[in-house]
Amino acid sequence: MTTASCIFPSQATQQDNIYGLSQITASLFISNSAVANDKLTLSNNHITTIINVSAEVVNTFFEDIQYVQVPVSDAPNSYLYDFFDPIADHIHGVEMRNGRTLLHCAAGVSRSATLCLAYLMKYHNMTLLDAHTWTKTCRPIIRPNNGFWEQLIHYEFKLFSRNTVRMIYSPIGLIPNIYEKEAYLMELM
């Protein structure tokens, strides 16, 4: 499935939302830790499940919200792969019960984005490239670390027996090929 733009364009254009809450699908949101602990924002967006993808962020437990903890650090050697299927299944289950899920880490940039991409590949039949393009349109600040990219590339191959993103060598080190132009421009500076 290729999608030209986010179905929630206001999320991508409102400056105050770039770092806060971003809606990815009708039932899935990504945010930083501050939003995940903001009862009014959670209530206004009808969040029923919060998935905390961090080892360092403490949950504020609100009534009527289910909490799931994925205690992983944002480091290239951290292992998220074993969480891809169970978390994607959980997000899908919440959606099937007409609930809404908030995925968050500390900044809403790497860990939560990684699990979002895995979910979109599994349940929206998106390639990794399409899932990244879609999510980045909805939340421009996403940038999974290189270790998570390698795990996502492996997961895409497991799901589809092909890859749309690959790791390449650049002047700044090993990067996903979708960042090749950006790395080249950085080198020119």
Swiss-Prot record:
E.C. designation(s): 3.1.3.16, 3.1.3.48
Ranges for region Sufficient for mitochondrial localization: 43-128
Primary localisation category: cytoplasm
Protein's membrane topology: Peripheral membrane protein
Top enzyme class: hydrolase
One Pfam family it belongs to: DSPc
Gene3D superfamilies in UniProt: Protein tyrosine phosphatase superfamily
Active site per the UniProt annotation: 105
Tissue: Selectively expressed in testis.
Gene Ontology molecular function terms on file: MAP kinase tyrosine/serine/threonine phosphatase activity; phosphatase activity; phosphoprotein phosphatase activity; protein serine/threonine phosphatase activity; protein tyrosine phosphatase activity
Key words, A-Z: Cell projection, Cilium, Cytoplasm, Cytoskeleton, Flagellum, Hydrolase, Membrane, Mitochondrion, Mitochondrion inner membrane, Nucleus, Protein phosphatase
Similarity-based family: Belongs to the protein-tyrosine phosphatase family. Non-receptor class dual specificity subfamily.
Role according to the record: Protein phosphatase component of the sperm flagellar doublet microtubules. May act as a regulator of sperm motility by mediating dephosphorylation of sperm doublet microtubule proteins. Can dephosphorylate single and diphosphorylated synthetic MAPK peptides, with preference for the phosphotyrosine and diphosphorylated forms over phosphothreonine.
Protein name: Dual specificity phosphatase 21
Higher taxonomy: Eukaryota, Metazoa, Chordata, Craniata, Vertebrata
